[in-house]
Regions:
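Bacterial N-terminal signal peptides that target proteins for export
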Residues: 2-13
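Hydrophobic helical h-region of N-terminal Sec-dependent signal peptides
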Residues: 13-21
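C-terminal motif of bacterial Sec signal peptides marking the signal peptidase cleavage site
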Residues: 22-26
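Lipid interaction determinants
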Residues: 29-87, 91-226, 235-279
Length: 279
């Protein structure tokens, strides 16, 4: 029994040392200009991550697309409300951040309720909260140091705090006019009307994005043409889509094996999903 008490005291002592160490690490250089220089800049830190602003979490894609996703909620009657996506753009010019949510899969949404505006003096600051200590198994202690957060000043003079949520490992986008996230061959099923007898027929469709700014559509043995595309701020503009002489623009999201193309208006939206393997 005495041995058990001694072991417990040792564990408590180790945890106390760990807490002391992380506290000193977090606070030791808070007034030291040299320590501030070690912080990553906001322009390097912001892209490709999810950030919490107020009560919402936003995805800051590397191609400057800004996305917020609402959660599906269970209502009083036991029904599940629909989850919505909110799309916009973000730009960081020097230390000035501009952001706005401009469209959504929710009809007639209120854009003013979401993160928007221009913020100056945007910079990172070190979180001095002390981090967390956890133990997954006896004798094992994990120390998690806090991530720096981002601060900016709005046009009203108030500070805006942007807190790190998680890294977006699935973000393969870039800010070029031929975003690499789209590159490759994508498959779908497409229904076309047979001009001979007026019946609908389902075909396997291929959409092939090339790095040179061309995209080829191949649908069964009835359609095969090549057109051009350009990307900007998470929107792709196509010279034609599926059919010739059918120009189109979409907000695009690429998650692993799927590319989702959203056509969003004020009152409705459509979403075409293309896959990296035949369906």
């Amino acid at each position: 029994m005495k041995k058990s008490k001694k072991t417990l005291r040792q564990i408590i002592a180790l945890m106390a040392i760990a807490f002391t160490t992380i506290s000193l690490t977090a606070c030791g250089g808070s007034d030291d200009d040299g320590d501030k220089d070690d912080l990553i800049t906001a322009s390097e830190y912001l892209p490709g991550k999810e950030w919490t602003i107020g009560n919402e979490t936003y995805s800051f894609y590397k191609n400057h697309l800004l996305v917020c996703e609402s959660s599906a909620n269970v209502t009083t009657g036991g029904l599940t409300s629909q989850a919505y996506l909110y799309f916009g753009t973000w730009q960081l010019d020097g230390n000035r951040l501009t952001a706005a949510i401009t469209s959504s899969t929710q009809p007639n949404f209120d854009a003013s309720k979401f993160f928007h505006g221009t913020y100056s003096n945007v910079h990172t600051e070190k979180d001095t909260s002390g981090g967390t200590i956890s133990s997954d198994k006896p004798g094992s202690i994990t120390i998690t140091e806090p991530k720096p957060y981002i601060v900016g000043t709005g046009t009203d003079g108030k500070s805006c705090y942007i807190y790190y949520h998680k890294n977006m490992t699935e973000d393969k986008t870039d800010e070029t006019i031929h975003d690499r996230a789209l590159h490759g061959t994508w498959y779908n099923k497409v229904q076309l009307t047979d001009t001979k007898n007026g019946t609908m027929k389902t075909y396997e469709a291929k959409m092939i994005f090339n790095a040179d700014g061309t995209v080829q559509f191949v649908i069964g043995d009835v359609i095969d043409f090549t057109t051009t595309y350009e990307t900007k701020n998470g929107t792709v503009t196509l010279g034609s889509y599926i059919l010739k002489d059918n120009p189109a623009s979409f907000i695009y999201l690429q998650y692993g094996p799927v590319v989702s193309l959203y056509d969003v208006s004020q009152t409705r939206y459509t979403c075409d999903r293309w896959y990296n393997t035949p369906q």
